Design a protein with these regions (language model features):
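DG-centered beta-turn motif at the end of beta-strands
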Residues: 56-61, 92, 136, 147-172
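Short beta-strand-loop
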Residues: 89-122, 164-170
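VWA/integrin I-like adhesion module and closely mimicked acidic/polar interface patches used
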Residues: 29-33, 83-86, 157-200
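Acidic, polar low-complexity linker/tail segments
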Residues: 2-6, 17-55, 62-69
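Surface-exposed acidic, glycine-flexible loop patches that form ligand/cofactor-binding
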Residues: 44-48, 81-84, 140-148
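Von Willebrand factor
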Residues: 23-39, 50-106, 113-155, 182-199
Length: 200
């Protein structure tokens, strides 16, 4: 009888430890809110001593990002690289038009690798898959880091279409882009002030 209780107890402990092992936190943010999300969620001076294993799941709408989206993504990843440590890991998986792993567990401070993926999303993906979202979770589970904060951050880029080589469409987009670029440049110049306000 004692032996039966010992076996049952050992089995319960094993099941409990396996159920707690692979906890993956999920976050979702639109591209427009990405910089603020990074400011709020990643800070090198946090009290948390846990390292981070972050898989960014970025929506794609063509072979490349438009200029405005590239600027936002690059600024966000530059800010992130300053807000994490060398022990933290970042992976990038793309979904929607291009589904695949674009960056596999690089040092979070390696800004060159991060920016290369933003500049060349299609060529960064070596193997195209059917479902990028499912792939991101499978990849994160396979590359789970014990005693680390493992997460998938979905970056949604709504209402974008791939560039069309039509002169009318191009002219309309150029006019819209000029207005959008002014907004992006204004936001980037205000970024240090926003960060200072948040820190206070």
């Amino acid at each position: 009888m004692k032996r039966l209780f010992t076996i049952v107890f050992a089995l319960l402990i094993t099941v409990a430890s396996h159920s707690q092992e692979k906890t993956i936190e999920t976050e979702s943010v639109t591209l427009d809110n990405l910089i603020m999300f990074i400011v709020e969620h990643y800070n090198i001076q946090d009290d948390s001593t846990e390292t981070k294993n972050i898989t960014f799941l970025i929506e794609t709408y063509g072979d490349d990002f438009n200029l405005e989206d590239k600027v936002i993504l690059k600024q966000a990843f530059k800010l992130l690289a300053k807000s994490v440590t060398e022990d933290d890991l970042i992976s990038i998986v793309t979904y929607s038009t291009i589904n695949g792993i674009a960056l596999s567990q690089a040092e979070a401070t390696d800004i060159k690798k991060l920016l290369y993926v933003i500049e060349h999303p299609k060529s960064s993906v070596k193997t195209l898959e059917d479902d990028g979202i499912e792939l991101a979770y499978e990849f994160t589970k396979e590359n789970f880091v014990e005693d680390s904060e493992n997460s998938v951050v979905m970056i949604r880029i709504p209402n974008r279409e791939s560039e069309v080589a039509n002169s009318e469409t191009t002219n309309k987009k150029n006019n819209t882009r000029k207005k959008s670029n002014v907004l992006v440049l204004t936001a980037i110049t205000l970024l240090p002030e926003i960060i200072a306000v948040i820190k206070d």
